[in-house]
Amino acid sequence: MAEMKNLKIEVVRYNPEVDTAPHSAFYEVPYDATTSLLDALGYIKDNLAPDLSYRWSCRMAICGSCGMMVNNVPKLACKTFLRDYTDGMKVEALANFPIERDLVVDMTHFIESLEAIKPYIIGNSRTADQGTNIQTPAQMAKYHQFSGCINCGLCYAACPQFGLNPEFIGPAAITLAHRYNEDSRDHGKKERMAQLNSQNGVWSCTFVGYCSEVCPKHVDPAAAIQQGKVESSKDFLIATLKPR
């Protein structure tokens, strides 16, 4: 049986019904080499603070539900292990989002941004009786990396521009738009570029690159945004040269 140790975890809590501002609470949690932060939060809720609020679902870094700040770095709780934080751990709600309660944030703008870029195949008239819509490996390679997003919101918590401008559609939405724009089956690029070319689109990004650094799926949203800027520049150049 693995040897159990104890770790003091600072959880920044907030209940809008009784608190005027977030405050810290400290909990002593037993752990071994396999204990994740999500396990620790479950222990706290079951044994120490039944009213602690946080999101979780799959426990396997697939659903993206358990994003939070760990020592000021956006992380998934299920992929964060206490063994790596023997000097202490501070857990907070994701940065740059309004806090609903404790570690739960309001993702409304995030979801609306994803919806706004129309994340689905547009203008493909192929029917089921025509068979599968086959792509070559090269065609799939253009967008495959950008299709791995799990909508966890870590890139928004990492993005300094989203922190300054909450209307910025953000890394995940731009990446998703680029994913579909690069899909050979899709014909909706013109519709999405209206969003990417807008004031709160790709040009709000100053290319810090922290969004790619914290991405748990190595999607590289920073690269997608820069490629989006290239496409936006093409649109601008064509519009400039087109006869009026």
Curated annotation (Swiss-Prot):
Q: Which UniProt keywords apply?
A: 2Fe-2S, 3Fe-4S, 4Fe-4S, Cell inner membrane, Cell membrane, Electron transport, Iron, Iron-sulfur, Membrane, Metal-binding, Oxidoreductase, Transport, Tricarboxylic acid cycle
Location in the cell: Cell inner membrane
- Which residue pairs form cystines in this protein? none
This protein's GO CC annotations: cytosol; fumarate reductase complex; membrane; plasma membrane
Where along this sequence does the record place binding of a menaquinone?
Y14, Q226, Q227, G228, K229
What would be an example GO MF term here? succinate dehydrogenase (quinone) activity
Tell me the protein family, please: Belongs to the succinate dehydrogenase/fumarate reductase iron-sulfur protein family.
Function in brief: Two distinct, membrane-bound, FAD-containing enzymes are responsible for the catalysis of fumarate and succinate interconversion; fumarate reductase is used during anaerobic growth, and succinate dehydrogenase is used during aerobic growth. The QFR enzyme complex binds 2 quinones in or near the membrane; 1 near the [3Fe-4S] cluster (QP is proximal to the [3Fe-4S] cluster, on the cytoplasmic side of the membrane) while QD (the distal cluster) is on the other side of the membrane. It is not clear if both of the quinol-binding sites are functionally relevant.
Name of the protein this chain belongs to: Fumarate reductase iron-sulfur subunit
- Its source organism is Escherichia coli (strain K12)
